[in-house]
Swiss-Prot record:
Highest taxon in the source lineage: Bacteria
Compartment(s) of residence: Cytoplasm
GO cellular component, one term: cytoplasm
Name assigned to this protein: Exodeoxyribonuclease 7 large subunit
Organism the protein comes from: Azotobacter vinelandii (strain DJ / ATCC BAA-1303)
EC class of the enzyme, as a word: hydrolase
Entry keyword set: Cytoplasm, Exonuclease, Hydrolase, Nuclease
Keyword Nuclease: yes
EC number of the protein: 3.1.11.6
InterPro entries xref list: Exonuc_VII_L (IPR003753), Exonuc_VII_lsu_C (IPR020579), OB-fold_nuc-bd_dom (IPR025824)
Job description of the protein: Bidirectionally degrades single-stranded DNA into large acid-insoluble oligonucleotides, which are then degraded further into small acid-soluble oligonucleotides.
Subunit structure: Heterooligomer composed of large and small subunits.
Record field: catalytic activity: Exonucleolytic cleavage in either 5'- to 3'- or 3'- to 5'-direction to yield nucleoside 5'-phosphates
Length: 456
């Protein structure tokens, strides 16, 4: 007789294999927990080549293995990562090969703000594919804006910070608030309307601004209609939503993203002190340039004046020279007469001493003859010199440009002082200087008519 406690108790013993045990446990679990929702945090995410996803879902006290097969993983595989809070649906099962308790999932969605982040990434990918984020769409901000439109809440620190920066750096810029809600159910429609209204006002640039907050607080700036309203603006838009770490879809669509509203004001407000320094430098350069230009024009004018000296001045010089020659000739004749007289006196003295009567008579005759010839010679010489001077004066008068001017003609000069000799040297609208016989004119060319070609 066998010593069997089960037999003594009258019980039949059923011995299961490990596979049988795991199979029965699996069937029991799948029957009782055919569909459950579980929330937790992903860890130990594995992505094998098969396309299935395996990870551990955990909370603070426990964890469970999860399997998400390929057909159900396609929609979410790109956003899953360790640490992501998710909400999953599936059935409880047992992996018989290892006896591992696990969840077989058919649905997974981000939990908390995870759903918002999923929507954020989907819209970001969609708008990027349309080219709304492309660099070639970005417009430069105005260097010296005169008016800025601010699309923001009329209350709070944001508008005060922006106004403070502009008052400090560029008080001359006109600021206009286009009020809108920036949080809540009405915010999206109000922001779109405010952007459309501001874009029609002719501002040099727009600032779309809001203070910091959670992802839910800033979500209106991640709505597609707001993003498209920003993209449709003809006015350059600076997005200044939240703090430096906050990123919205509006930031990607705007022409420029500023980390904070104050930074947006800094970017658009030119420093007035720096502008004044630049203006002073430009003024000094302009004054120096004008002095150099005036000096060059004076030199050019002096040169032209010397080249266009009046022929009368040359005649005056020739007349002065003739008078000088006449004076010198008179003095020379006087000196010669005086010398002859002195020599005659000496000869007379010598003759008187020697009494050469015959020689004295001859000398007296010769002297008388010379005295008769001398005035004629002087008159002849003066007449010849005067005739030469008159001929020279007539020649100068004939070739003088002022003689031509005196007949009603004019000399045309361009802005560089060059003479205009043909119509092709001038063009309509050009300013010319006309020199007349008396005075000058400033002219403007209405039309130029070149001479027709001469026949062969």
């Amino acid at each position: 007789m066998l010593n069997d406690p089960f037999q003594r108790l009258g019980l039949d013993r059923e011995i299961l294999t490990v596979s049988q045990l795991n199979g029965r446990a699996r069937a029991l679990l799948e029957d009782v927990f055919a569909q459950v929702w579980v929330e937790g945090e992903i860890s130990n995410l594995a992505r094998p080549a098969s396309g299935h996803l395996y990870f551990t879902l955990k909370d603070r006290q426990a964890q469970v293995r999860c399997a998400l097969f390929r057909q159900n993983a396609l929609r979410v595989r790109e956003i899953l990562r360790d640490g992501l809070a998710v909400r999953v649906r599936g059935r409880v099962s047992l992996y018989e090969g290892r006896g591992d308790f696990q969840l077989i999932l058919d649905l997974l969605e981000p939990a908390g703000d995870g759903a918002l982040r999923l929507a954020f990434e989907a819209l970001k990918e969609k708008l990027a594919a349309e080219g709304l984020f492309a660099a070639e769409r970005k417009r430069p901000l105005p260097a010296h804006p005169r008016s800025i439109g601010i699309v923001s809440s009329p209350t709070g620190a944001v508008i005060r910070d922006i106004v403070s920066v502009f008052r400090r750096r560029a008080p001359q810029v006109e600021l206009t608030l286009v009020p809108t809600a920036v949080q809540g159910r009405e915010a999206v429609a109000q922001i779109v309307h405010a952007l459309e209204l501001a874009d029609r006002q002719g501002f040099d640039a727009l600032i779309l601004a809001r203070g910091g907050g959670s992802l839910e607080d800033l979500w209106c700036f991640n709505e597609e209609v707001v993003a498209r309203a920003v993209a449709a603006c003809a006015t350059p838009v600076v997005s200044a939503v939240g703090h430096e770490t906050d990123v919205t879809i509006a930031d990607f669509v705007a022409d420029l993203r500023a980390p904070t509203p104050s930074a947006a004001a800094e970017l658009l407000a030119p420093d007035s002190s720096d502008l004044q320094r630049r203006l002073d430098g430009l003024q000094r350069r302009l004054q120096l340039r004008m002095r150099h230009l005036l000096a060059a024009r004076r030199l050019q004018l002096d040169g032209l004046s010397r080249r266009l000296r009046h022929p009368g001045e040359r005649l005056q010089q020739q007349a002065q020279r003739l008078d000088d020659l006449e004076l010198r000739l008179r003095r020379a004749m006087q000196r010669r007469l005086q010398g002859d007289a002195e020599r005659l006196a000496r000869l007379d003295t010598r003759l008187a001493a020697q009494h050469p009567e015959r020689l004295l008579g001859l000398l007296r005759q010769r002297l008388e003859h010379l005295a008769e010839r001398l005035p004629r010679a002087m008159r002849s010489t003066l007449r010849e010199r005067r005739q030469r001077l008159e001929a020279t004066a007539q020649t100068l008068q004939a070739v003088s440009p002022l003689a031509t001017l005196g007949r009603g003609y004019a000399i045309l000069l361009d802005e560089r002082g060059r003479a205009i000799r043909a119509a092709v040297q001038a063009h309509p609208g050009q300013r010319l200087h006309a020199r007349l016989a008396e005075g000058a004119l400033e002219l403007r060319v209405e039309a130029a008519f070149p001479s027709p070609p001469q026949p062969d």
